[in-house]
Amino acid sequence: MARVCQITGKGPMVGNNVSHANNKTKRRFLPNLRTVRVTLEDGTTRKMRIAASTLRTLKKQNSK
């Protein structure tokens, strides 16, 4: 499935655009996906599309 984080499964959400006149139209909020190379536990590297928030969490966990 497109536009989904391959680790957490985060995907698009639905919300509204709200104008100054308070008119509401549907819109989609897309996750901030980044294509990065991830080193797996067995030592192989793999390209994955992950959300920026997931990337931040992974960097924080690996620094400990």
UniProtKB/Swiss-Prot annotation:
Among the GO biological process terms of this entry, one is: translation
Could you list this entry's UniProt keywords, alphabetically sorted. Answer: Ribonucleoprotein, Ribosomal protein
Gene Ontology MF terms in the entry: structural constituent of ribosome
Q: Is Isomerase one of the keywords UniProt gives this record?
A: no
Annotated S-S bridges: none
| Claim: Ribosomal protein is one of the keywords in the record | yes
Looking at the record's lineage, which domain of life comes first?
Answer: Bacteria
What are its GO cellular component terms?
Answer: ribonucleoprotein complex; ribosome
The entry assigns this protein to a family as follows: Belongs to the bacterial ribosomal protein bL28 family.
Which named protein is this? Answer: Large ribosomal subunit protein bL28
Species in which this protein is naturally found: Campylobacter jejuni subsp. jejuni serotype O:2 (strain ATCC 700819 / NCTC 11168)
